[in-house]
Amino acid sequence: MTAKCIMVLGTTSGAGKSWLTTALCRYYARQGLKVAPFKAQNMSNNARVVASDKGSGEIGSAQYFQALAARSVPDVRMNPLLLKPEADTHSQVVLMGRVSDALTAMPWRSRSNHVWPHIAAALDELRSENDVVVIEGAGSPAEINLSGSDIVNMRVARHCDAACLLVTDIDRGGAFAHLYGTWALLPERERVLIKGFVLNKFRGDAALLAPAPQMLQDLTRIATVATLPMWWQHGLPEEDGVFDDRSTASGAVKQTVAVIAYPRISNLDEFQPLKNIPGLRLMWVRSPAELAGLSASDWVILPGSKATSSDLAWLRAQGLDAAVAAHAGRGGAVLGICAGLQMLGKALIDPQGVDGDAPGLGLLPLVTVFELDKTVRHTQATFADGIAAPWHALAAVTVSGYEIHQGITQPQSTPATAGEVARAVLPGGLAWQNAAGNVLGLYLHGLFEDPGALQALFGAQLNGPVPTLDVVFDRLADFIELHFQPGVLPGLLT
C-alpha cells in the first residue's frame, strides 16, 4: 500500500491550513479510506500526549485532532518535529515525541540535514500503512529566504508527489495577490503540484468575486476550487501559533473566565470548549485593568507556560500579580493549570540554575522544584469528595487529561501559618486547594475537555449536551463537501 498524498499549503500563517486539513481527514475517512495526517514540523506550544506501538511522547495539538478526525490513532510519526518556543530566539526541539537536547542546542539552519531523514522515514511509513495521507504545510511555501533549508513545505510535497491545495485568507484582503505571488515565486517543478486555489473566510456573495478567479486561472492555469464562507464557531481550537485575541461570549454574559495571556502561554487550545457555553465570556488578559471589573463569581485562570519563570516575571512586571491576589482576596475563584499551579505557590526552585529560583505568587503554600526530566503522560484521576466551593461540583468526578511538565510540587516543609493549608484534591500531587477553597491548582491539562467535568461545572448553563469531537469533525466534512466544486475532492486522489 502506498498512500496518495494530499497537501494543504497556505499563503500565510493563519490562512486556514490546520482546520482544512482536519476537515479533509474526516471527509476521506467517511469514504471508507484509511487516512493519516502529517505535518513535518510544527512550531507551537499547543501539544498533546500520544502513546501507541509506534512510540510515545508529544505532538502538536493540530495533528492530534487531525488524527482523531481521520479515525486513526495519534502517533509521533504524524508530527516528527515539534518546536516549542521558549523565547523569541529559542525553541525546545521535540523529535519523534521526545525532547532532543542536541537539536535544541543546534542553530536552526543546521537542523534540516539532521532531521530530514526522520521526517522522510515517518512519512514513508505512514504512506505504506494508509490509503491517504493528508499533509499540512507551515506558513507559506514561498519563503524564498528559507527554501534552502525547507523541510516542511515543498520538499515534503516533492518527496511524495502530493496533490496540493493553496489556501488564502480572503478576509485579510489581497487574496488574489497572495495566491498569484506565492505561485509566481515557486519554481515550475513545484507549481505543477498545485491542483487548486482555495479562498477561505469569505463574507458575502461569492458571485461578486468575478472575474478575478478566472483571471487568476488564465495567469496560472490553476482553478479556484472552493470559496469557503467565514465560519467563526467551527468548534476546533485555533490554528497552531495563531492566538485568538477576541473575547467571546455566547448570549447574555452571566460569568467571565479571564485567562492570563502571558507571552509563552501553552495549551491554550484546552479552553476551546468554554467558547460554546451560553452566558460565559472567555477573555484573554494582559493588564490589571482587565481584571478590575470582575466579580467574585468570575474566574481568573493562570494557564500553562513553556517558560514558567520568565512568564511569571512578565506577570509581575505588568502588575498582574497584585491584580490576581486582589481577586483571590475578594473570594474570587483562581485556577492555575500546570505552570499556573507552579506560579501560585510560594517558591520555584531551580537546582540546575537554568532560570534561577523565583518567589511564587504565594496563593498556595506549595514549593515547586524543577527537574531536567519531563513528565509526559495521559492521566485519569478522581477529585476528592471534600473539594470545597467554588469547585465543589467536581467532588467525586473522575476526569481524564494529560500532563506535560518539568518539576515536582509539594506542600512547603516549614510549618504553615494559621489557615495556610494546601489540601490535596487529586491523588499523586495532581491538584491542591487553599483553605478558603477559592484557589485551585492542578497539573492536569484538559479539565474543560472532559465531558464529566464540563457538565459538573457548567451543567446549568448548557443547552443540552456539548457537541462531541466526532460531531465537530463531521460538520467540518459536511462544510467542505458543500463548498468545494463538485468532483474536486475525489479528483485529488486520482
Curated annotation (Swiss-Prot):
GO biological process: cobalamin biosynthetic process
Residues annotated as the enzyme's active site: C338, H445
A Pfam entry, by short name: GATase_3
SUPFAM superfamilies cross-referenced by the UniProt entry: Class I glutamine amidotransferase-like (SSF52317), P-loop containing nucleoside triphosphate hydrolases (SSF52540)
Pathway named in the protein's UniProt entry: Cofactor biosynthesis; adenosylcobalamin biosynthesis
Entry GO MF terms: ABC-type vitamin B12 transporter activity; catalytic activity
The GATase cobBQ-type domain, residue ranges: 254-453
PROSITE patterns the record matches: GATASE_COBBQ
Keyword terms of this UniProt record: Cobalamin biosynthesis, Glutamine amidotransferase
Purpose of the protein: Catalyzes amidations at positions B, D, E, and G on adenosylcobyrinic A,C-diamide. NH(2) groups are provided by glutamine, and one molecule of ATP is hydrogenolyzed for each amidation.
NCBIfam families: cobQ (TIGR00313), PRK00784.1 (NF001989)
Homology family: Belongs to the CobB/CobQ family. CobQ subfamily.
Protein's name according to its UniProt entry: Cobyric acid synthase
